[in-house]
Amino acid sequence: MSDPRERIPPGNSGEETIGEAFDWLDRTVEEINRAAVNHLPRELIFQVWRRSWEYWHDEMGMSVSYTKYRYLCLIQKAMFMHCKKGCRCLGGEHGAGGWRPGPPPPPPPGLA
């Protein structure tokens, strides 16, 4: 008889699909963007998004999902550092920040 402590927890059966992982990644990117806009300048978020695509996707030839994952890691790190330094935002938006000349970069998911 097997030990009941050895059972696989619900939701971790290995039956999840790659499609579900991609859906999770898309949802998570949108959610962190909605949260990040309350703590980080929009220009920073947009530039990290744009540079992630330029570097990881265009220059390095990585997949769309890998590019989104790398962007997610960078924004999570930025949010962590912001909160670690003592967030005093209280839910207020920072606004656009210092926009560079020319049209703004395309917004990341969740900020369109």
From Swiss-Prot:
GO cellular component, one term: virion component
Single GO BP term: viral life cycle
Gene3D superfamilies: 1.20.5.4730
Role summary: Plays a role in nuclear translocation of the viral pre-integration complex (PIC), thus is required for the virus to infect non-dividing cells. Targets specific host proteins for degradation by the 26S proteasome. Acts by associating with the cellular CUL4A-DDB1 E3 ligase complex through direct interaction with host VPRPB/DCAF-1. This change in the E3 ligase substrate specificity results in the degradation of host SAMHD1. In turn, SAMHD1 depletion allows viral replication in host myeloid cells by preventing SAMHD1-mediated hydrolysis of intracellular dNTPs necessary for reverse transcription.
Family per similarity comment: Belongs to the lentivirus VPX protein family.
Signal peptide segment: none
Compartments reported by the entry: Virion; Host nucleus
Record keywords: Host nucleus, Host-virus interaction, Inhibition of host innate immune response by virus, Metal-binding, Viral immunoevasion, Virion, Zinc
Nuclear localization signal, short sequence motif: residues: 65-72
Binding positions (Zn(2+)): 39, 82, 87, 89
Main location: virion
Subunit structure: Interacts with the P6 region of unprocessed GAG. Interacts with host VPRBP/DCAF1, leading to change substrate specificity of the CUL4A-DDB1 E3 ligase complex.
The keyword Zinc appears for this protein: yes
Name of this protein: Protein Vpx
Pfam families given in the database record: VPR
Molecular-function GO terms, alphabetical: metal ion binding
